[in-house]
Amino acid sequence: MSFSADFSIPNTTNAFGYIPTEANYIKPFKRPLSSISPTIVEFPNGTVYISHASAGGSRIITEVAQHLWHVLDQNLTSAESLAQPRMHDQLSPNTVYFEYASAFQHVEGYNNETTAFMKSIGVNIAFVAPGSTTAQALRRLGNGTFEAAGDPRQLNSAGYAI
């Protein structure tokens, strides 16, 4: 029997501790819904600016959104963006998950000031190890060349552009 964490089982939380969703209950010939979110951002002229993909089940969408925010709004490189700490809010349960630091994976983690502030405004917080999501990214630079980056959370992950 094969196992897929993408299917939901009634009254059983998934690998991330999230409640099951009826749309993903196991049924004959059923395919699970997916959070897969390969993303392409284009320049106004239609050429590719960013190509990005992520793995991580329920946490994919928040990883993609954070990567785009870091690159588009904060002007980070793809490698800098992928190395940033991540947070995830599934809405149910009512908890925001923050990555903690990992020197081995070259991830800083969220600082105590950020998480203390969230807690002070009534947010339930929890900490997770880096690596619950991983991603790869490609970005076209202004001179027409590309930068590619692999997630430091994955052992031997890298990007290479010619």
Report the location of each language-model feature.
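Alpha-helical support elements that line or immediately flank enzyme active sites
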Residues: A53-L76
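Hydrophobic, well-ordered secondary-structure elements that form the walls
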Residues: I40, V64, S81, L138
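Active-site rim segments in enzyme catalytic domains, especially the processed small/beta chain
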Residues: M1-P44, Q74, S78
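In a subset of proteins, long, contiguous C-terminal domains/tails are tracked
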Residues: G109-I162
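Short, solvent-exposed loop/turn segments at the edges of secondary structure
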Residues: L33-I36, E63, T133
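Compact, glycine/acidic-enriched structural inserts
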Residues: V71-I121, I125
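Short, well-ordered beta-strand elements
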Residues: E42, V48-A55
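Extended active-site and interfacial segments that coordinate phosphate-rich ligands
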Residues: M1-D6, L68, Q154-I162
